[in-house]
Amino acid sequence: MGEERYDLEKTYTESFFGWDDNAGEQKILAQYFVPKIVKLFNPKYVLDVGCGSGQWLDEYRKHNIKIKGIEGSSNAWVTMSDETKEVVTQWDLRDTIQEEDYNIDFAQSFEVAEHIEEEYADIFLHNLIKDDPDTVLLTAASVGQHGIQHVNCQEREYWMTKMKNMGYLFNQDLLNEIKSWDRPEACPFWWPQNLMVFI
């Protein structure tokens, strides 16, 4: 099936997950936006696909929300909290997840899709929606957005079409609501630019 896959462990190293700018950015975003997401969507069980070191999961836990994470590189565990390690499964997102359903109602994946080769894009999305969540938040790097192993940068319409074919519709009203929120000074440009909401 196409070219040989790149090695997740060699690409997403301990230094990648321990990189202060990267980890700090995610923590700031999670601390700021999770309370607002909880208020708007009232999730009961959150799945974070490509959860990295689990900063978002840590914040959801503070709101007494059940959490589950999937991460491809074992190097993410180096900076992961002990509590989060218990609920994160290592899995290559280019393969169909074999675990039983988690019965989640809210799924998210932030800046992961562009790291998945295009030939595996549908598998990645199926992993994201495997439990038929009510709501999906997704960001994916757009064309020309540079980053480590950005192998499938696409415009939003690409992901919208794929999600529609899987039964999920892009919701502009909910996206507008989220975009109306104030953003922390450290908020990266990709958060509002790449965000999509599906229901």
Language model segments and positions:
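Short glycine-centered segments of the SAM/dcSAM-binding site in methyltransferase folds
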Residues: 134-137
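A short His-aromatic
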Residues: 115-116
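Conserved N-terminal segment of class I S-adenosyl-L-methionine
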Residues: 1-110, 119-131, 142-146, 150-158, ...
